[in-house]
Amino acid sequence: MDTRDVRRFNRYYTRILGVFDQKVFDLNYSMIEMRILGEIGRHPGITANELTNCLNIKKSYLSRKLSKLEGGGYISKKKKPDDSRSMHLFLSEKGLELNKYVEEQSDQKVLELLAPLDEANYQELVTAMKTIEKILYRVVPNELESGQ
């Protein structure tokens, strides 16, 4: 198996995504912090363990990021009734507002990036992305999306 094409595509796609990375939309938060906020927003009550699996990051790293977001008033933690060591994570009002802003800005950036494409090229791109996701899901399933 020759990995050069896969690695080339990864470098190219990562460079495209880099447009969104530098201090996300002039906020004092990183892309991973905004991803954490987004996952909590999409999955209210998610646990830290579920987040580490979903984002493929270490628990200690996630813990630091959650502390920053909690300290900023963007998230809240609630103990699970059956396990006091495990916490459910939720967005606060402030977190909901920031998440909405970032989602809107992200949508706008994608629209700007893809504006040169006509409808046929756009549909071809989306179909190709879905194909890539379907194939890669066989090796790295997304636990949250699969309902696990």
Functional labels for PLM-detected ranges:
Residues 1-31:
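N-terminal leader segment of winged-helix/HTH proteins
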Residues 10, 17, 55, 99, ...:
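Short amphipathic alpha-helical/adjacent loop interface patches that line ligand
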Residues 17, 44, 99, 133-136:
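A structural signal for well-ordered alpha-helices, especially hydrophobic packing surfaces
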Residues 21-61, 66, 72:
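N-terminal helix-turn-helix DNA-binding core of bacterial DNA-binding proteins
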Residues 38, 100, 126:
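A cross-family signal for key residues in well-ordered alpha-helices
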Residues 67-123:
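Charged, amphipathic alpha-helical coiled-coil/dimerization segments
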Residues 104-148:
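Terminal interaction helix/tail motif
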